[in-house]
Amino acid sequence: MLTRRRFLTTSVTACGLLGLQACSGETDYAEAVARIWRHSATTLDDAAARTLELVRYATLAPSSHNTQCWKFRPGGDGISILPDFDRRCPVVDPDDHHLFVSLGCAAENLIQAAAAFGQHGEARFVSAAGGSVDIALTPATAQRSPLFEAIPNRQTTRGDFDGQPLDREELGLLAQAGRGEGVQLLLLTERQAMEAMLELVIQGNTAQIRDPAFIRELKTWIRFGEAEAVALGDGLFARSSGNPALPRWLGSRMFDLFFSEQAENDKYARQVRNSAGIAVFVSAVNDAAHWMAVGRAFERFALQATALGVRTAHLNQPVELPGLRAQVSDYLGLKPGRPDLVIRFGRGAEMPRALRRPVAAVIA
């Protein structure tokens, strides 16, 4: 019988001749991480350079499967963030909900960075022509907030947390950061409530893993090795989830053999139980404008968590399936309102980083 250990041992032996290439890939990956996940090295007095740097900070926001489903259009006294529908995920996100949440996350990063560069940003959702987030920028006194400082350190951390609770002050700061107009934030820290959400997460995860279309889409966005991650600059880097970096042909084969419903459900059960709590973001109205607002609120929450040394990760399975989403609403007593995001949080080790495409690739 082919076990995971035997497969890995055989595969590593077979790949021994690729050692030098792997070392090169690791070096390129480390250089890419250092180049992407950083603060600006100099003061930016040139308006054009400052605009590009604002876009760079915006791209450090999270997006579903790290698709980076956005385009940025500078113009006049502001920047518009447009959806890139070529990077949508039609299986896991058929109504483009996560896509517009991602635009909101990028908008919040841009506004936090603009304040640090001496500009006040005001975001407005425009529904015409597929929807966009228009950010007007006006001169202001430069102010580097803790949320801005946290941008290069924020990470969707797909590892275990330490199981320790947060104190009341920390929970209060997270609650304050996650508030938004038309957005409700629920913080679940009681074990009974977390177990109830875990049951819904496992139901959703099971349904998704049994869906071949979901698996095909997920696999499309996995970057199995450093060289692939660096070349494409997007997607879910295998090492970010605690898996080994492998050439795509080998990583793909390993995924097919060992990615299983039981293993994933066991992982989520362990990770919920070693989290300090679960955050649920709820939009008052189920439309793209409010999804964008949820993205902004979540990004503030994630940045505040980062500033506190707290990590976050998504548990969105129960809000990605309509039937389970209704069960989440019923359990939490959400009438009206759409549960948009389910986030676990707690303290834990940093994982290897996902990458980003160059700024030039996202300018419309």
Where are these predicted regions, by residue range?
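Acidic, surface-exposed loops and disordered segments
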Residues: 2-364
